[in-house]
Amino acid sequence: MSKICPLFSGSTGNSTYIEGATGAVLADVGMSCKAVTDALQYVGGDIEKISAVVITHEHIDHIKGLKPFLNTARQAMLISTAGTLEALEAAGKIPPHTKTIAIGEETLEAGGIGISRFETSHDAASPCGYCFFMPDGRKISVCTDLGVMTDTVRGAVSGSDAVLIESNYDIDMLKKGPYPAELKMRIMSECGHLSNNACAAELPELLKSGTTRFILGHLSRNNNNPLLALSAAKNTLTEAGAAGGSDCILEVAAPKNNGVTVL
């Protein structure tokens, strides 16, 4: 049985647990090691099953607890792009014992889970998202920190059974909010984040490709709220003919996991 469980999602930290029948992978470790291990225990995850930690990019809300976590889950290898691994090494975030793998165009395997990456547009060294090919044949994708939804991202996540996709900010809240103009422009740029409306616009094509589980993630604490993100997404899915109930599940990833597991 496959499952994806966002342990933390948002401005303060991000970490997602993906589990299959024979192993598990952790995507990002953006909170303290204790917080992540406590969250794993809360959702019934097993740190001993984690064969790999994959990192999307080197910003602190994705790597805060990385080094202590790798010192705890010593069996886990570290997978990321060559540019991100170089940035992590320079920042002293990789323990000496940890095996690192720079992922390229190939599909890697960890704990019986296939792992591929796709390029994303964000202001980091070499950011990426990931697709996970589960032992039961399901495909799970994680794509956050997207300045823009490119054809590369669309092609990679198409056909996913479940997608964790960024819905970072409400445009009106951001424009009217207290952030400096320069920061607002950075967030709205092609190297920033994906708005609720931009996220919602992508969901109908995902639905057509077979996606039935949608998780809205990385919501801004100051420039968004779950009801706005859900409303934008629900409207476009309904217009696209999505059925409710178990046929099409739409969730918002909470800042701290509330026990919700998808799939």
Write out the residue ranges for each language-model feature.
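Conserved beta-strand hairpin/beta-sheet module of binuclear metal-dependent hydrolase folds
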Residues: 1-43, 128-145, 162
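Structured catalytic core of nucleotide-sugar glycosyltransferases
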Residues: 5-15, 52, 57-64, 76, ...
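Active-site environment of divalent metal-dependent phosphoester hydrolases
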Residues: 12, 59-63, 85-87, 124-125, ...
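Active-site neighborhood of phospho(di)ester-bond hydrolases with catalytic His/Asp-centered motifs
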Residues: 27-30, 50-58, 79-82, 141-144, ...
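Active-site metal-binding motif and surrounding structural segment of the metallo-beta-lactamase
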Residues: 33-80
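Metal-dependent catalytic neighborhoods of phosphoester/phosphodiester hydrolases
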Residues: 64-74, 89-91, 224-231
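Metallo-beta-lactamase
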Residues: 82-137
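Cap/insert and terminal regions of metallo-dependent hydrolase folds
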Residues: 151-252
